[in-house]
């Protein structure tokens, strides 16, 4: 499906990150996600990254093009197929996220938008995208990635030990949080919510 936009098209019913609950910033529960697109050469093809803020556990989806319908459908697919608990999603203001209201209604979640040019407000995504670029460098053609290749990279990064978790992997932290009813506080007490690099 081809999608077109006028350059001045607004994203309707946008909810600012300023209204996001404080608990999201605390990273004390699973289910608060950041979403972004890592673009391929000439903006043809993209990888959607869907990152749990508290644990760093991330799911990847391949988009041959970055239209809003394709983006919304991929997010819905990741949520449904992985049976995710979702409280909030935060993204930038790209037109590809203009179907946010449909996601909010379908999954009973709150969707927030960061301020323009404030990439640090989505720090989990930004840090993860830098790791992803080790496998898919800037300028790479992302139109024809296989599901097997994407899953291989997803598993590698989810199983890579991270400093912020005392060198546990995002997958380990995520699975422990599920056993702890979604609560991540017990895992992060020794970190005192310090903003350490991935």
Model-derived segments and spans:
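Short, surface-exposed connector motifs at secondary-structure boundaries
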Residues: 55-59, 81-87, 135-136
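Short, structured coil segments at secondary-structure junctions
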Residues: 106-107
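Mobile-element integrase/transposase regions
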Residues: 1-47
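RNase H-like two-metal-ion nuclease catalytic core shared by retroviral integrases
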Residues: 91-93, 98-101, 113-134, 143-155
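Active-site beta-loop-alpha junctions of metal-dependent nucleic acid enzymes
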Residues: 42-43, 60-83
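Short conserved beta-strand segments at catalytic cores or DNA/RNA-binding microdomains
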Residues: 38, 42-59, 64
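Mobile genetic element proteins and their domesticated derivatives, centered on retroelements
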Residues: 36, 50, 56, 75, ...
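C-terminal domain-tail junction helix/linker
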Residues: 138-198
């Amino acid at each position: 499906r081809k999608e077109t936009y006028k350059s001045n098209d607004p994203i309707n019913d946008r909810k600012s990150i300023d209204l996001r609950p404080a608990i999201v910033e605390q990273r004390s529960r699973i289910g608060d996600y950041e979403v972004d697109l890592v673009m391929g050469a000439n903006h043809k093809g993209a990888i959607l990254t869907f990152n749990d803020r508290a644990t760093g556990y991330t799911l990847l989806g391949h988009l041959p093009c970055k239209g809003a319908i394709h983006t919304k459908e991929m997010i819905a697919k990741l949520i449904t197929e992985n049976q995710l608990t979702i409280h909030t999603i935060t993204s930038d203001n790209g037109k590809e996220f203009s179907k946010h209201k449909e996601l909010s209604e379908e999954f009973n979640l709150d969707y927030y938008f960061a301020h323009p040019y404030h990439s640090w407000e989505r720090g989990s995504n930004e840090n993860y995208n830098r790791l992803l670029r080790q496998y898919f460098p800037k300028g790479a053609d992302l139109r024809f990635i296989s599901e097997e290749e994407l899953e291989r990279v997803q598993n590698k990064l989810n199983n890579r030990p991270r400093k912020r978790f005392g060198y546990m992997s995002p997958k380990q932290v995520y699975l422990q949080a599920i056993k702890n009813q979604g609560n991540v506080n017990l895992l992060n007490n020794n970190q005192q919510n310090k903003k350490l690099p991935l």
